[in-house]
Amino acid sequence: MTRRAVRHCEHFSLCVNVGKKGHVIAEDPRERFTIYQYNIYGGGKAGVMFEEGYIESQVGVLMDLRPHVHKKVIFEATEDFFTIGFNTLDKNQNWEGRLVKKNETKLDLNYIRELEKETFLICFDGKPVVNNKQMKRYDYARINLSKDYDIKLNNGALGLFFKN
């Protein structure tokens, strides 16, 4: 059994899957909008139907799934899992994403500032502090590119995403 939840924003959505070892999920490209994935714990193997090879999920890593958004994908849990997906609302809209680095005490926005793109910070885990405000899992904030942001990860995980 898997529990699923979705949190919508006007620019993207977050989907959450929590399940047990052995569970199988099949996603049709008409329903698949996940372009990045972060595993809190556990995981499994995912592959594109009728293609060789698979991707093995990794805990604490932001996985880039953009190449698979238009494909039929099957996932089998090799252990109990808790996964958060970053979803585009428009498959023709590209997003770039990365995790904030453990040693990043000021949010590095130099490249994004040059591009002047809409940017969001998302809390995947823990209780990081951004400009003296504590975030919790699933919180997100639009980044004002004219400001600087002080970061204390506190063993948490923050994702930085911008439309490209």
Walk through the language-model features, giving the residues of each:
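Jelly-roll (double-stranded beta-helix
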Residues: 1-164
